[in-house]
Each structure stands twice: as structure tokens, then as C-alpha cells.
Amino acid sequence: MNEIRTKVQIVDIDEDMAGQRIDNFLRNQLKDVPKSMIYRIVRKGEVRVNKKRVKAEYKLAAGDVVRIPPVTLEKKDPETAPSTKLNKVAELQDLIIYEDDHLLVLNKPSGTAVHGGSGLKFGAIEALRALRPEARFLELVHRIDRDTSGILLVAKKRSALRHLQAQFREKTVQKYYFALVMGEWKNSCKVVNAPLLKNEVNSIVRVNPNGKPSETRFKVIEKFPQATLVQASPITGRTHQIRVHTQYSGHPIAWDDRYGDRRFDAYTAQHGLNRLFLHAANIRFTHPATEQPMEINAPMGEQLEKVVQSLRTSR
């Protein structure tokens, strides 16, 4: 069995690294090391902070000195790496629509999860880390559904992550989505205020008086014979919020496998659609370093553009 043994690392913690748990810090430093091994070396006291043992939940402070012990890993056979995974990683390079020293913005394709887990070994964040092996820090600022395409913010510094997530919590980030919904959305329907409750067993979200307050603002962009293209802006950030609010209003989104309408899906399939028509198209926020206002636009993609064009010609 071929094995690789890493070298001892001594890391001085600066302000940007401070505030995170030691286990999360080690997962970023030892990207190919299994989580179980990381927790084992912490538990055994092989990881030292300021020459002392620490627990996994220890939060790093500026000025700490971390000793990361050598670890032994099985050498992977490059021929066993699935080419489909490598192809997906390469494709994402062309979908990075903004990048600087503090953040990166990806125009995530539909069908790609934001991160691995729940049976998925591959996600957008894992792909970006593969594309940027030299990056010391890459973390998701927020999430969008697997089948939703569009803007995904990724922080390249911990300080940027804290700054951007604070903006999301304070609801100062403005997000705008395009959605193709069934039927004629009335111009007068500009706001949907309906509490949402998530079923923890099957993850289905429903409007429920016992749910969390949820608000989405809508604007009609274009009307077609049996569909409407709307702009949706979620004021709150609940799971599946836009998808459930459109369904609740009687206008489910095309190709929504949880909250949609099969007859409408069949109709839009005639116009070339075979995926959820929900796209995170625009985001506005404050840059975490310069404090300047930022506005990022993500094009819808060829398939969605062709569907809209086909619907226009069907009038």
C-alpha cells in the first residue's frame, strides 16, 4: 500500500483565522484527511495550541500557535479518479463570475449541490477548493437549493465570511431571482407574507400558522399564454421559500419536483425545459473589505433563455 506522510506544521494564528473552532481550522488545513482522523489526533493530544492540549470545540485566538502533527494517508491512484468529477470541476472554472482577494462569486449550475453530504461526495464548495488548492480558506457564505441555478457567494477570508454573514442576518443583502410560474401572475400580487414550517422528517415545507414568518416580494417581468416570468426577492431566508410561496399563491414554479404541477411541467417541456426554472440572477451587498456597494449579475444560461424565447414565439 502506498502511503504519504505529511510534515509537522506550525501555524501562527492571525486576526483572520481567529474565532473558528480548532476542528474546523484543521479540516481546512488538512483537506484530504478524514474527519475521523482529525478528531482522533485532537483527542489524543497530538494537536497542540500554545504547547497545550485542547478539545475539538476550542476557539482559536489571534496570537495562538498551533502545532499540527504529521499524519499518514493512503496514496490515491490517480487513475481511479472519476473523470466525470474532474469534468465538473473544470466546468465550474468558467462559471466564476467575480473574484478578488476576499470573495468569489459562482454562477452555480442547476443540479449541483452547494456542498457534499447526504450521499453526495461532490459539491460546489469541494470543486472550488480543488480549483483553488492554494487557497487557505474557502467557505460558503449562504446556500441555494441544488436544482436552483445562479449566484453563490464564497468567502476567501474568515473576516469576509463574518462580514457577509452579518449582512445576511441583518437582511441588508438584496437577492433577486427569476422564476417561471404557472398561469397568469396578477400584477397586484406584489408581496406574499405566509409563515413556513419545515417537516423535519421529509424536509417538505408548508405554509403553516405555527411556522416562521416569511416574506417574498414579486414583480411581473413578462407574461405568456400559460405562464409568467416573475422576479422574486426573498426578504427572509427560509428553506424553499420562493418555491412554497409561489405554490401557495396558486402559481408553482416550472419543474419543481416537490411543489410543482406535472401538467405545467409537460407544457414547458414542449418549450425545451427539463429543470427547475429558478435562477438567482442578481445580488447586492457591501464589500467586506472596501465597504463599497456591490452588485453582481448572473446570466440565466442558454437553456432558460431559449425557453423564454420559445414561449414568446408561442403567443
UniProtKB/Swiss-Prot annotation:
Domain S4 RNA-binding, residue spans? 20-93
Please indicate if the UniProt record lists Acyltransferase as a keyword.
no
Pfam families for the chain: PseudoU_synth_2, S4
Q: Name one GO molecular function term.
A: RNA binding
Domain of life, source organism: Bacteria
E.C. no: 5.4.99.24
Record-linked Gene3D superfamilies: Pseudouridine synthase, RNA-binding S4 domain
Q: Which UniProt keywords apply?
A: Isomerase, RNA-binding, rRNA processing
Q: Which InterPro entries match?
A: PsdUridine_synth_cat_dom_sf, PsdUridine_synth_RluA-like_CS, PsdUridine_synth_RluC/D, PsdUridine_synth_RsuA/RluA, RluA_PseudoU_synthase, S4_RNA-bd, S4_RNA-bd_sf
* Catalysed transformations (reactions): uridine(955/2504/2580) in 23S rRNA = pseudouridine(955/2504/2580) in 23S rRNA
Residues of the active site: 145
Could you provide one GO biological process annotation from this protein's UniProt record? enzyme-directed rRNA pseudouridine synthesis
Family (UniProt): Belongs to the pseudouridine synthase RluA family.
Q: Which NCBIfam families does the protein's record reference?
A: PRK11025.1 (NF008249), rluA_subfam (TIGR00005)
Function recorded in the entry = Responsible for synthesis of pseudouridine from uracil at positions 955, 2504 and 2580 in 23S ribosomal RNA.
Q: Mind telling me what this protein is named?
A: Ribosomal large subunit pseudouridine synthase C
> From what organism does this protein derive?
Vibrio vulnificus (strain CMCP6)
